[in-house]
C-alpha cells in the first residue's frame, strides 16, 4: 500500500492530488490547488514549497510524482514553470522522497489511453477512476492524473519483475 502525491506545477496555480494505491485498488485522499496569485516570484516559490511540505507532513506519502517541463512558446513562462517545479521537488527531497517525473503525454496515455487527450477527458477519467461525485478542478485533476500514472507505472514494474521482463519507467531522482 502506498500513498502517492502527484503535483502539477505552475507559477500561479500548482495542483496537488493524493491517492492510496494498493495493487489495483485506488483510493482518493485529497486534492486541491495552491494559488499564489500576483506575489513576487520568491514568495510564490516559498508558498509552493511550504504548502507541499505541510501536505507531506500530514499525509506522509511514500511516493512523489511530478510532471516534466515542456517547452512553452514563451521562454519566460518556461523559466517560471521550472522554478515552481524546483520548489516542489525540493519540498519532496527535503522529506526524503524520491522524485518520479512523467511527461504530459505519458500521464494522458496512462489515464485516458491516448497521449493526445484534452483536459476535459483527463478530468472525466480521473473522476471515473477514483469514483468521485464530481469532476475535480483542472489543475487538481492533472495532479491526480500524475499520481494515477505513477501508480500505473508501479504496477507495470511489479508485473514485469514477476515475469522477468524489462520495463521502461519515468525518470527517477533519488534524494
Curated annotation (Swiss-Prot):
Mg(2+) 2 binds at residue 67. Binds 2 Mg(2+) ion per subunit. CDD domains: RuvC. Keywords: Cytoplasm, DNA damage, DNA recombination, DNA repair, DNA-binding, Endonuclease, Hydrolase, Magnesium, Metal-binding, Nuclease. Its EC number is 3.1.21.10. It comes from the Bacteria. One of its GO terms (cellular component) is cytoplasm. The active site is at 8, 67, 139. Mg(2+) 1 binds at residues 8, 139. Its cofactor is Mg(2+). One of its GO terms (biological process) is DNA recombination. Its main location: cytoplasm. The keyword Nucleotidyltransferase does not apply. It is found in: Cytoplasm. GO terms for molecular function: crossover junction DNA endonuclease activity; DNA binding; magnesium ion binding. Transmembrane segments: none annotated. It catalyses: Endonucleolytic cleavage at a junction such as a reciprocal single-stranded crossover between two homologous DNA duplexes (Holliday junction). Pfam families: RuvC (PF02075). It is an enzyme of class 3 (hydrolase). The RuvA-RuvB-RuvC complex processes Holliday junction (HJ) DNA during genetic recombination and DNA repair. Endonuclease that resolves HJ intermediates. Cleaves cruciform DNA by making single-stranded nicks across the HJ at symmetrical positions within the homologous arms, yielding a 5'-phosphate and a 3'-hydroxyl group; requires a central core of homology in the junction. The consensus cleavage sequence is 5'-(A/T)TT(C/G)-3'. Cleavage occurs on the 3'-side of the TT dinucleotide at the point of strand exchange. Belongs to the RuvC family. Homodimer which binds Holliday junction (HJ) DNA. The HJ becomes 2-fold symmetrical on binding to RuvC with unstacked arms; it has a different conformation from HJ DNA in complex with RuvA. In the full resolvosome a probable DNA-RuvA(4)-RuvB(12)-RuvC(2) complex forms which resolves the HJ. This is Crossover junction endodeoxyribonuclease RuvC. It comes from Marinobacter nauticus (strain ATCC 700491 / DSM 11845 / VT8) (Marinobacter aquaeolei).
